[in-house]
Each structure stands twice: as structure tokens, then as C-alpha cells.
Amino acid sequence: MDKFQRYLDLNRAWQDNFLYPLLFQEYIYTIAHDHALTRSIRSILFENVGYDLKPSSIIVKRLIIRMYQQNPLIILDTDSIPNRFFAYNKNFYSQILSEAFAVIVEIPFSLQLVFSLERKEIDKFRNLQSIHSIFSFLEDKLVHLDXIPVSNVLIPYHIHLEILAQTLRYWVKEASSLHLLRWFLYEYCNWKSLILPKTDIWFFSKRNPRFFXILYNFHICEYESIFFYLRNQSSHLRSTSSGFFLQRIYFFXKXXNLVKVFIHXXFQDILEFXXXAFMHYVRYQGKSIIYSNNTTILMNKWKYYFIHLYQYHYYMWSQPGRIDRNQLCKQPLDFLGYLSSVPITSSLVRTQMVENAFLIDNAMKKLETRVPIIPMIESLSKAKFCNALGNPISKPTWADSSDSDIIDKFLRICKNLSRYHSGSSKKKTLYRVKYILRLSCLKTLARKHKTTGRVFLKQLGSEVFEEFLRREEVVLSLIFSRNDLTPGSLYRGRIWYLDITSINDLVNLK
């Protein structure tokens, strides 16, 4: 274990650059007083001309003083009237204080993200766009593998928040900051039981989403660091990580060579893995997806590792049923709005040899990516474009807009969904979604003009709605060089347009 000691040491630079909230003293209350300011504070901190983005608490404090001076109406003397500040609504002020605490704690991680993007020479404003024939963790030749085990691991979620707070002790060495952190947690949770009820932690995550995301990401970062360390020791090839951000609130960038490991003594026997593992790891919506071409015995060892990781390292009793194992040829993988599978299709070939004829059954594998119809109908129904059965309905909240604005809104949603799901191998579900949006747009316009959809379509003409049925053009990203996208490669694979910044329009519309 001596030669791996460098992986077991903490990265001291993170501790030195950590911005302790108590350094700002009364200025944290200034941020908390203006609740709307917390949404744009990071843009204010990082977009001021004249400041170089270095992890310096002096620069951040000067910026906070500058904001404090721009709002003269904020007069808060925390030394003279501490009780009066909390006398009106204790829960409300503790909530906005926790959000201000989270904003300041996010600063070093945002700086770390900017530095990692600069090292990779990627434009930070376009880092959420990517194009690939299939998802990056499915880019290997899956069709040539005999068995493709996939483990869908449910990450422990309903855990005691004290465990989340203790995770910060490796990063924050200041006792006062940890005491302040625990004070926020005491406002919402009951500390008598080791495992919190689902309602308590759900309430905390809803009231303080930013604060909870920081604690939860600390928890997951430590969990993943152990897994990456063991995976590197079991493979001859060093794993390469990629920054794939589904939401801006997940501010962790998985950069290469950024491994921080804290191994329990019970895991030393796990290091006996010596086979060259072919493994990929993806985290998405509280689940970790692991797939490999390993044998069943080796995958069972990884399952044994995960169960013991939860029990001995996080003090969380984990049921074996929380880890699902399946093969892509038998059960599809639900990931990022796609159902990916590798079905085995048979084709009969008739061969004639002299007087005898033979029928040869050839089994072929092909990676298929389908769009699930039920979640799509549920999303459209939630946004009031159709009912629960998928029948299109009008959008009453848009009836006050102009005709061109209504058509543009529906077209924007239709194009975003069409581009995002253009990588599907079967377009039947995508065509049905376009049909629902087209009729919903027609019903909305008819509702505005107080007529029926059929009469309005005759008056307006069907040419207006041809955009809904027009085939999407291939969109190329500017991140990749021209050498990476040769004309031959464009025709061999399906091109996916994955624009994370705009695919959530359907969910966010009211």
C-alpha cells in the first residue's frame, strides 16, 4: 500500500483555496437579505472586468463590499440586534442564510471548473453541447460482445445529514464553519435517528436545493473517488474522465488525475483485482450505471464491493436488491431519455449446394436506441399539450400571444425534441410527438380565434404547419475539429445533437 500512498493524501491546494464563509463576517448577511441576489451572484463575481479569476478570498470580499455599497437600504447590525434579526421568521432567515452559505462555498468549485476548461481549451460557454453517433459510454463495439452486464446502482439517498456534514471535514479544517453548517441542519432535521425519514430529507432538499446539492455532491465525490481508485488498480489502462454536466448545479468537473481516496481497512482485499477490466461508469439522477464485458463472477465481486462500501464507509445498510444486473440483449437501459439495447436478430439465409439446400440461421447484434413513448406522453401531458392518453389539447396560457409567437413557441419545442432524439434508431415515437405538438398548436390558434381547428386550418392553409413535419438538418458542433468529423464518419453513424441548455424547455414552460 506504500506505493499508492500518493492517492491517499488529500489535495492540500483545495484546502488552501477554500473560502471560509466566516471570513466575510457581516457581508454574508447582506447577501442573504436580498434573496433574489443569490441567483446572479456567481455571474457578478466572475464577470467583473479587471479581476483575474484566481481563488483569492480578498478579491471575493472586495466584490461583496462593492455590492454592499450599491444597496444603501440594507442596514443590519448583527452585533447589536442579533435576536431581532431572527424574531420575525426564523425558518425563512435560516433558509436564506443557508443559501448564502452555499453560494460562497460554491466559489472555489466554480473556479476549479473554469480552470479545468481552460486547460482543455474548450469554450466554457459551449461546453454543454456535444455530438456523437451514440452516447460516449456506449461508443465501444458492444455488438461484438457475447454478454454485456449492466449494473444499475441506486446511490444511498435517505441517509443521516450528519454523515454528509462529516464528509466536509476532509476539505474544511475550520471548526467554526462546520458548526455553522450543523446549525443549518438542526433547523430542519431530527437528529435522534440514524436514518432520516423520506419526508424530512425531501423537505430539506426542496427548501434548500442549492445547499443540499453541495452536501450531496461532496458525498458522491468521495464515493466515486474510491471507485475510480479501485478501477484504476484493476485495469492496465488508466481511465480517462470526461466532464459531462446535466445541470449547472452539479459543479463537479471530473478531470483526469483528480483522485482523492479515503479507503477503509475492510477494502484492502478488493485490490486483488488483476484482470484487464473493460468498464464504464456513468452517474445520472441518483443512480450509477456501470457496464463491462467482464464475466459474471467479476461483476458479482463488484456488487459485493458496492454493498460493503455502503455499510462500512457510509454506515448505510444496503439491500442487494438495490443493485440491478441485466444484459442489454435482454433488458434495455433507460438513460437520458433513451432506451438502449442490443437485441439479437435472426436472419435466414438459403444456401444451395449441388442438389441439397440448407437454411442457415445467422444471429446478428445491433445497438438500438429507442425513444420511450410513455415518458414522452407524460411530459407533454404535464406541460398541458395533451391529456394522459396522448390526445392533443390546446394551450390556454398561450392564447393571448400573437399567432406568430404561438407558432414559434411550438416550433422551438418541436425542433429541440427532434434534434435531441434524432439519434434514435426508430423514429415512430418522434413522429407521434411532432403530431401531438402540431395539433396542439392548431387547437391553441383555434381557441384564440374562437373557431374550430378544421375551419381555422382551411382559412390559414396547411403550409404554415409544414415546418413541424420537415426533416431536421444535421447540426455540427464547433467544439470538435474538422478532422474529427470526416464526411465518411457522418454517413456511417447516427448524429446526435445534445444541447443541454435548451432541451429542458418542455419541462420549464408554464
Swiss-Prot record:
InterPro entries listed in its UniProt record: Domain_X, Maturase_MatK, Maturase_MatK_N
Keywords linked to the UniProt accession: Chloroplast, mRNA processing, Plastid, RNA-binding, tRNA processing
Coiled-coil features, chain-numbered ranges: none
Cited Pfam families: Intron_maturas2, MatK_N
GO biological process, one term: RNA splicing
Signal sequence annotation: none
Molecular function terms, GO-annotated: RNA binding
Compartments, record wording: Plastid, Chloroplast
Taxonomic superkingdom: Eukaryota
Any one GO cellular component localisation term in the record: chloroplast
Main location: plastid
Classification via PANTHER family: MATURASE K
Family under the similarity heading: Belongs to the intron maturase 2 family. MatK subfamily.
Described function: Usually encoded in the trnK tRNA gene intron. Probably assists in splicing its own and other chloroplast group II introns.
Protein name: Maturase K
Taxonomy of the source species: Eukaryota, Viridiplantae, Streptophyta, Embryophyta, Tracheophyta
Encoding gene per record: matK
